[in-house]
Amino acid sequence: MENVLFESFFEGKHIEVIEKNGIRSLQSDRKIVHSRIDLNDPEALISPYQQQMMLGMVLSLGAESVLHLGLGGGCMVSFIHKYFPLIHQVVTEKSQTVVALAREYFYLPESPSIQIILNDSTDTGPISYRSYDLIFLDLCDSEGPIPTFQIIPYLEKLKGLLMPGGWIVANSWKEGLALQGQLKEWQQLFAKVYYVEGLGESSVIFASQEQEVLLTVGYPEIAARMAKAIPLDFKTFLSALQSI
């Protein structure tokens, strides 16, 4: 049985918090799921694309600062806060309602290490006061991940926010030839671009400024070590990466 815990219309979207079979979801217009949690283990990441995106923590080992563009239910923010509590996280989200829903229904913690900036995520001005080791790009509207991060000028701004050795990890709904076209745009700006497709309706893009990234050297050991402390199969996620 499906229970509607919250329902509202704002910014032209029909926003709901739905609970069914022990899974709570934040969704818009009855077709886009922004976040999902298992009520028996609310701190676990259960969305395959978000699990894959967390490989960024392996690639950016030792990260001290993480930027999230888009909050949703805050599942990735909460996950990082639990397993990497010393990392400073900055989150941009334009809707105070979404922030409130993340706190009430998805248990987003309040912590000095989590800074939420109420602002349109496509505006990099308020977040440019510092650099970041890792940037998660997960922006979405009623049609899916928005095309903003296909625009070269926007990617250039984000690239300028990265620390040396930093990575950008992005959610994309493209696959096949459409995804390859998007990846070529990224390749214009980044020395290394990897991707994984077939994660439900999502693909994930990984981009680095570093010329020499050897995924077979060092990273498998890091992934195996991290998987002992964190309930994610990082070695499988690493082996799934494809280069363009």
Regions found by a protein language model. Name each.
Residues M1-N21, S25, V33-N40, M57, ...:
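SAM/dcSAM-binding transferase cores
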Residues I32-S35, C140-E143, I168:
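A short, flexible beta-alpha/helix-coil linker loop
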Residues A44-L161:
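The AdoMet/dcAdoMet-binding core of the Class I SAM-like
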Residues L86-H88, S111-S113, G165, F190-K192, ...:
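A generic structural signal for alpha->beta connector loops
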Residues I152-L214:
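C-terminal substrate-binding/active-site "lid" region of AdoMet-derived donor-dependent transferases
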